[in-house]
């Protein structure tokens, strides 16, 4: 997927949901762990050299797996390219778990499923569809796959 470089640069400058300097290894042969500033903004994980303001890369956190590896280490791999695996080593196990949880919550699919879940809970409690007032209650993106019309 291609992105507009200026838009990505602008997005990388937005406030981060989570940011830290951690060790990172990219999926290149012979790659070693390097200290990077890693910044989660919406569903993008930007990574920077620690002394630079512009990102050197960005990962779109869709269709990916966030996996706990050994102690203090997690990885991100992509479902359609499992060999493309990024590894991150945190300072502590607690920091590692916080990153894993934040990254799993960052995807559009997670947000969509959460919206559907809470929509159904509100509907059970009130008897009303909370999206109806916005005229979007029948849109496919707000339906579970089995309920799409």
UniProtKB/Swiss-Prot annotation:
The record places domain PH at: 15-108
Pfam families attached here?
Answer: PH
CDD domains with a match to the protein in the record: PH_PLEKHJ1
Q: Which GO terms describe its cellular component?
A: cytosol; early endosome; recycling endosome; trans-Golgi network
Instruction: Tell me one GO biological process term.
Output: receptor recycling
Q: Which InterPro entries match?
A: Boi1/Boi2-like, PH-like_dom_sf, PH_domain
**What protein is this chain from?**
Pleckstrin homology domain-containing family J member 1
UniProt source species: Gallus gallus (Chicken)
